[in-house]
Amino acid sequence: MAKQQDQIDKIRQELAQSAIKNISLSSELERSFMEYAMSVIVARALPDARDGLKPVHRRVLYGAYTGGMHHDRPFKKSARIVGDVMSKFHPHGDMAIYDTMSRMAQDFSLRYLLIDGHGNFGSIDGDRPAAQRYTEARLSKLAGELLRDIDKDTVDFVANYDGEEQEPTVLPAAFPNLLANGSSGIAVGMSTSIPSHNLSELIQGLILLIDNPDCTINDLLGVIKGPDFPTGANIIYTKGIESYFETGKGNVVIRSKVSIEQLPTRAALVVTEIPYMVNKTSLIEKIVELVKAEEITGIADIRDESSREGIRLVIEVKRDTVPEVLLNQLFKSTRLQVRFPVNMLALVKGAPKLLNMKQALTVYLEHQLDVLIRKTQFNLKKYQERFHILSGLLIAALNIDEVIAIIKKSANNQVAMEALHERFGLDEIQARAVLDMRLRSLSVLEVNKLQTEQQELKALIEFCQQVLADKQLQLKLIKEQLTKINEQFGDPRRSEILYGISEDIDDEDLITQENVVITMSTNGYLKRIGVDAYNLQHRGGVGVKGLTTYTDDSISQLLVCSTHSDLLFFTDKGKVYRIRAHQIPPGFRTNKGIPAVNLIKIDKDEKICALISVNDYQNGYFFFCTKNGTIKRTSLSEFANILSIGKRAILFKENDVLFSVIRTSGQDDIFIGSTAGFVVRFHEDTVRPLSRAAMGVLGINLNQCEFVNGLSTSSNGSLLLSVGQNGIGKLTSIDKYRLTKRNAKGVKTLRVTAKTGPVVTTTTVFGNEDLLMISSAGKIVRISLEQLSEQRKNTSGVKLIKLKEKERLETVTIFKKEEAIKTTTATETDDVGSKQITQ
């Protein structure tokens, strides 16, 4: 026991005499963690605000520079660059260095490439670069501008990790790389995320800052529009852009560039540019996942047609889906649209600092001033040293005989140098230069060259001294340098900035506001077609096939409206349903369309009898008329909250159905026509307004087997158009029709014969509209009413459309020429001048 105790005492004595100290564990953890955190912040994760580079990026570029891998030299194996960098400057894993170098060679990662890569350096699909032994690389031409004049003492150098090499603490950076290429990184307790910008815009911003140091953030926003990402895409201008310009923090909304193309059988969404840092393969997988989960149901097929020419992702749209609405769903559910968080944190004088746009530009500008001053000082010293030597050489040349004699008499160089100093006042440097001078330099020609060089050096010395003394001249030189960079490397924006678009996407934000024709068949198939799809034909023309129908189906409704209009569907059961016009999928003249039951909750035995487009529910009335002549007037405001599930619009007797609904102003004359060729005319205000659920009053007195065939107003025209079932029609002035009371028999307007057939349409027009007629076979003929001459009452009219045997006229629609051509805007009238009348 005593022996063991002696050993313990001995160990305690040795420990007491050693350098081991007793310290607090919590204090040591705090100190060590702070050292680690600062190491990560300063030496790994955050870029320097001056050159925009992290240490590993700087070391890769400088390693390639010292290895002679310039842009005008042959490519070298990537493994050679990685090996040089790892052995001299960055003693970490080779894959970390290679990944860094590869990223600087990827045009989808960096806005302005710093490495010119040769071989497979990865793809936007997430493919990794080929092994470094297979790929080759060199500095890009633009990277040379980052390193320009680095050999002129423009930046500080420090010893590398083993003290055998010197590496720069920052690069001269002749262009603002921090903002041009951006940066991202996660440190301890902080992170940075800086978007790339357009180099030309940045240089314009720097020139603005030089010319006007007091410029505001708004001034900078005038020239630097916002981020400009390597992959292009669209940027939605939001307050987030203004925020990071002002504070250094914000969000940028990036939206894929997508067009809608019409394939032979269906529409397709074609994606040609995707947001920055979005993996294309992962994007496709996410879309497929959503389709399988039935979260998105409008996609028929998706395929990747990308090539060397660029991205092309084709998403085929199902026929019953509106492409714009599907695109909106994809923007909301996938990375076709992303938010890029901006946190402009960078190292300023070795410490992390959050910079706004002006501060970032100012830090770079100060760095350029420092680089210019140091380069000028370096050049000045070099010029002065050379000037000093030339002065000695010229003294010797002018006294060459005496100089030669002194040299010949001298025992050695030291004696000769002392003699030259005593005789001509030459210092050691000048005397040594004289001794090193070759005999051929003594010729008159060479002496003249020395004198010329001395004069040039004198001018350069004076210029350098002027630069060092004049800050405005320094700024002027920087402007000239930036202008040259812009001329050589400036390029157009890749990312288009969209103004006036809400960040919160609504379906209609993506739908073009334009005039369309909405058609519906007897069996309830709806279709949306562009107005220009129909050919204007001369009176009596045969027409074009307007709609392919099933064997027992034919066209019953047609309406011209805006894609942003409300569509109100009035049914023969007296109900009304509402959707937006763009919810009807676009189609072709020859396809069948989409069943109305897919869009509105209509009963199987319910038939749509009127379509009306509305944008404003504040003014006007709906005027109803049933097939048996019952009428009702109701304010538009009572229909403002109609849904697709429908509401009651009118009540009527059990043996009746709703024939038509029109819009009125409250001051119109109402015209109601019958199949027997009679028309009744009365003042609208003789019918008092009733609620939606009310039953109306009689408007026309009909005989048995007679039905209403037309409902229109005096504000819709000064002529009355009457068209028979066999395509015979005519125009008559409404002045020929006297006012009557409602529920009158009316006056004769068209003489009904076997040639005319029953009257299918009676409506008011101005006479300068276009007339669209649809036959039972689906033919559409479009003529101008200006081709028809005015006729008297009770005449038969002229042929308007050629019909085959057993073919009859089903639908007649009137619309204004101008509004059928131009795109409807939000400020235009609700109805686009359209009137539809059905038998």
Swiss-Prot record:
GO terms for molecular function: ATP binding; DNA binding; DNA negative supercoiling activity. It is found in: Cytoplasm. InterPro entries: GyrA, GyrA/parC_rep, Gyrase/topoIV_suA_C, Topo_IIA-like_dom_sf, Topo_IIA_A/C_ab, Topo_IIA_A_a_sf, Topo_IIA_dom_A, Type_II_DNA_Topoisomerases. A motif (GyrA-box) lies at residues 537-543. Pfam families: DNA_gyraseA_C, DNA_topoisoIV. The active site is at Y134. PROSITE patterns: TOPO_IIA. Keywords: ATP-binding, Cytoplasm, DNA-binding, Isomerase, Nucleotide-binding, Topoisomerase. Its EC number is 5.6.2.2. Residues 46-510 form the Topo IIA-type catalytic domain. It catalyses: ATP-dependent breakage, passage and rejoining of double-stranded DNA. One of its GO terms (cellular component) is DNA topoisomerase type II (double strand cut, ATP-hydrolyzing) complex. Its main location: cytoplasm. GO terms for biological process: DNA topological change; DNA-templated DNA replication. It comes from the Bacteria. A type II topoisomerase that negatively supercoils closed circular double-stranded (ds) DNA in an ATP-dependent manner to modulate DNA topology and maintain chromosomes in an underwound state. Negative supercoiling favors strand separation, and DNA replication, transcription, recombination and repair, all of which involve strand separation. Also able to catalyze the interconversion of other topological isomers of dsDNA rings, including catenanes and knotted rings. Type II topoisomerases break and join 2 DNA strands simultaneously in an ATP-dependent manner. Belongs to the type II topoisomerase GyrA/ParC subunit family. Heterotetramer, composed of two GyrA and two GyrB chains. In the heterotetramer, GyrA contains the active site tyrosine that forms a transient covalent intermediate with DNA, while GyrB binds cofactors and catalyzes ATP hydrolysis. Few gyrases are as efficient as E.coli at forming negative supercoils. Not all organisms have 2 type II topoisomerases; in organisms with a single type II topoisomerase this enzyme also has to decatenate newly replicated chromosomes. This is DNA gyrase subunit A.
